[in-house]
A protein has these predicted regions:
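Short beta-strand segments
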Residues: 6-7, 57-58, 99-104, 154-155, ...
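Glycine-rich nucleotide/cofactor/substrate-binding loop typically near the N-terminus or early
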Residues: 39-93
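Active-site rim beta-loop-alpha module in soluble metabolic enzymes
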Residues: 143-151, 155-204
């Protein structure tokens, strides 16, 4: 069985502020290590549960955060930026039995984490699809479903886990922390890794019968930007329209068209 892990940093245990997520700062290194160790815990658990192949994609920033030496020997790591359409890298296809997300965070404008954001924190204020607030979990879970692959697991802040469970009923989750203003109440990294690894056998078992959620027949997307000039510029995307000084709308029936829109306007 084959599994694909998307790994981000803002949802890992103990990360609290933006400085810890940015590689230019001294406080980043421990968080990058924790990102790698949580991904490693998921991979170990998957292999122990019967997985034959595990691919981990480094999703944070430039995609060069995870120290490959910290991963299980038989895991594979996708590093860097492929410049594929969002959620449709050439590496990920319908041959996978399940997608898992580690270290994910709440959506832009949501309170689950002081570092809540959607893709680009300095640019995107809020993103909705068919009236529902979407973050990165929702974007990628639907991208997996578009490929016919179920999303089995997510770890990250409590807000993200709750939203993810509403998006994918039956989803396995490990909450790492809860947001409180510009602070977090966090589990210890050791406990989070134990919980992630311990849940992977259940994820492997679930993959044998799991089916991806049905995609909507139509997608109405609204992206609200921090700056009005970004909205104006992105409104020139074919099929997009400016519906307020800071909000661009886009409609499509095919989720692949939505992902292409995201690639060029986020």
């Amino acid at each position: 069985m084959k599994f694909y892990i998307l790994c981000d940093i803002e949802g890992v245990a103990s990360l609290t502020c933006w400085d810890e997520a940015r590689s230019a700062n001294a406080c980043y290194a421990p968080m990058a290590q924790e990102m790698a160790l949580e991904a490693a815990a998921a991979a170990r658990g998957l292999f122990s549960g019967g997985a034959d192949e595990v691919v981990i994609e480094d999703m944070h920033g430039d995609g060069c955060n995870i120290d490959c030496a910290l991963l299980p020997r038989d895991a594979r790591l996708l590093r860097g930026i492929t410049h594929d359409i969002v959620g449709l890298t050439g590496i990920f296809d319908e041959s996978y039995d399940g997608m898992l997300m580690v270290g994910f965070h709440d959506a832009a404008s949501a309170p689950g984490n002081p570092t809540s954001h959607t893709m680009v924190s300095s640019r995107i204020f809020r993103l909705t699809v068919n009236g529902a607030l979407w973050g990165e979990f929702e974007m990628y879970a639907h991208a997996a479903a578009y490929r016919g692959v179920p999303t089995l697991f997510a770890s990250g802040d409590e807000g993200m886990c709750a939203a993810a469970a509403r998006t994918v009923p039956g989803l396995l989750t490990v909450p790492t922390k809860s947001g409180h203003g510009y602070g977090v109440l966090t589990k210890t990294p050791e406990l989070v890794r134990e919980e992630i690894e311990g849940m992977m056998a259940e994820a492997v078992a679930a993959a044998k019968t799991a089916v991806p959620p049905a995609l909507p027949e139509h997608f109405h997307v609204e992206v609200t930007y921090v700056h009005h000039y970004d909205a104006y510029g992105c409104s020139h995307y074919p099929g997009a329209s400016l519906i307020s000084p800071t909000t661009v709308a886009f409609d499509a029936d095919d989720y692949g068209d939505v992902l292409r829109f995201f690639y060029f306007v986020i």
